[in-house]
Amino acid sequence: MAIIPDKQDGTVLERQEKKLKPPSMYKVVLLNDDFTPMEFVVMIVQEYFNKDRETATQVMLKVHREGRGVCGVYTRDIASTKVEQVVTHARQAGHPLQCVMEEA
């Protein structure tokens, strides 16, 4: 907090400093389906989430076994962009892969 004297009438003003809070974070989650090939899911995780093959395979297996797998945690705008990119790529390739974002 800073104290600033007012030159007109001698009163003192206090400036409240804004406390910045970190941005909300969102998980990008792939959802399982019975049609998208496992290898396609691995490729998506590698390409859009910058994971190595082993990590991408682990995410794919989690999606396959548990119905969902977290690919990463990002700010809202980045998470939204990644969801859109993944869904668009999947549709262009003819796969029904679903990708969603959830508050972390």
From Swiss-Prot:
InterPro entries: ClpS (IPR022935), ClpS_core (IPR003769), Ribosomal_bL12_C/ClpS-like (IPR014719). It comes from the Bacteria. One of its GO terms (biological process) is protein catabolic process. Pfam families: ClpS. Belongs to the ClpS family. Binds to the N-terminal domain of the chaperone ClpA. NCBIfam families: PRK00033.1-5. Involved in the modulation of the specificity of the ClpAP-mediated ATP-dependent protein degradation. This is ATP-dependent Clp protease adapter protein ClpS. It comes from Paraburkholderia xenovorans (strain LB400).
